[in-house]
Amino acid sequence: TQAGKHVSFLIVTDGRMGSVDPALFGDELVQIRQAESMKSAALLGVTDVTFLPFFDGGMYEMEQVACEIAKQIVRLKPDAVFAPDPNVISECHIDHIKTGLAAKMSMNMAPFASVMQSIGLEGSHAVKALAFYYTDKPNAYIGVLQTFSAREEALSLHKSQFDEKQVSDICMYFTLRSARLGLRRIQGFADGYRALSPTHMHCFPEASEWVR
């Protein structure tokens, strides 16, 4: 948002299954998580936040998530969609994996009016890029030196999910990762993304080798 771009957050799962307080879970935790998400988004300058109704913990069908993401793409008409990389070998968080896979699937749904009509929505929209974060194969880098402190502050607002030590540890990891990625492009701190254009998204396996 600092660069003048309009950003929308789409939160797929409701966070009901995990808290720093083991006695806090279920619907009560969902309400807290949503309030924390809104505060964190506002701090980052994001006012458009949508919550999907999927239970935390992966007990849902990935195809259902893809349909909902596709509907939001048609509604919001974004230039780019950002999602966790589902192809990282070490990633074991099922919600991250399913969300990333659903984002991939939605890329072949939202551009086609006939597909969207089959899931109950008129219209279509083709994004210009799908960018994966939490990736081990970045090919696009964005400098984050000017916004790095806001990331830590936004993370600290998720008090039901992270205690102070966890926030500190995560931010230390972010610092080390951003410094390492920044060195690749000689621009201080940077975030890395695995970015795909529409050309790369279908019947183009060489993109896995060439898009670097």
PLM features per residue range, with description:
Residues 60-212:
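Metal-dependent de-N-acetylase/amidase catalytic core
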Residues 1-76:
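Active-site rim/loop-helix segments in enzyme catalytic domains that contact anionic ligands
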